[in-house]
Amino acid sequence: MPPETTTDDERPVSALQSPEEYLGDLCGRHQIVLLGDQVGVRQHLGFLAGTLTELADNGVENLAWEFTNSRSQAELDALINAPVWDSRACADLFVDLLGAGFGYEEYAEVLHAVWRHNEAERRRDADRRPIRVIALGLPTYVEDPDLLDGRSAGELGLRNWSLGGHYRDMSAFHAASVLTTEVLRRGERALVYMSVAATTTGLVEWVDGSPTTSAGNLLWRWMSDGCRRVVFHGTVADTAATERVEELISRSPEGRGGTDIRFGLDLAASTLGSVAMTEVHGSLDGADTSLRLREVADGYVYLGPRADWEPCALIDDLITDENFASAEARYRALDPRPEPYTRDELDEVRRSGQQELSGAWPPLPEPPEEPKRRFARFRERGADR
């Protein structure tokens, strides 16, 4: 008899929550949920754009992110609340981030998705509160080439410094302050989408022998259980842990079912939470200790294997005649030279940055080495005798 085949309808249904349901439910139970990511992962931005209905249904009024500078909040509000979508105004917001390299279609699509969601909600229920996007980005004064006297920010040691303090620390205090003013004091809820390094809560990471400060650290000290950290699979820079998580998933009932797996879960009571972290260095409650995944994050979103990540696509025609002068001045502050850059040169800089996105992500696990065929060669020599 031929072997029995399992149809799609007969495969076991996973008891895990979908990542959208999980994130919406978590945001409904905590005032601030920090979602940590690497820069430029296409699938993750698509997921974020698709969570808006779940967020709104769970009472979340705000999506905060660091990919628009706070100085552009008025323009961001006008874009999201406009009666007609303005793709040019959206692109201009990302010109303000050209030096940091966020002129990508998928980031713009998140803003467009918020606009579409709010427009649909207004048509259905005029009293329903829209989702607001809160800008957390903090530019530095080294963007002005006139302040650098022909030298680069790197040469002057200023690239990571702002207002007399280290930029990572200053941006952390800035983001926490904005969230306090715009969310906490209003008694509202927010999903905060930031780079994974900015979302640490109880964990204090050490870089070059010194402790770091993140927006998540500050919020967690103020709010404790009111603040939770969620990370995407593969975003924490620990290759061995990423490999171990994928191994555990492949051995799970869902993994053996042969279907695509997507889920979100709390790590505290999960087997995945016990995965050891060997490449993340930091302290909990002031003491250095060996870390497990549940001590690095509260929640986990799995959309697929780390090897499936794809980089975002560039926004077409980001640089125009109207914004070229300001964009050129900002880039010349980062990479100064006597003569101004041309528009073609700025476009080439953007293309190079897009090609380098994947190189900045945590590395993939090394594939296992194939065994050497020594015995085969020995048999071949024996046969010749």
Regions found by a protein language model. Name each.
Residues M1-R385:
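Compositional signal for N-terminal targeting/processing segments
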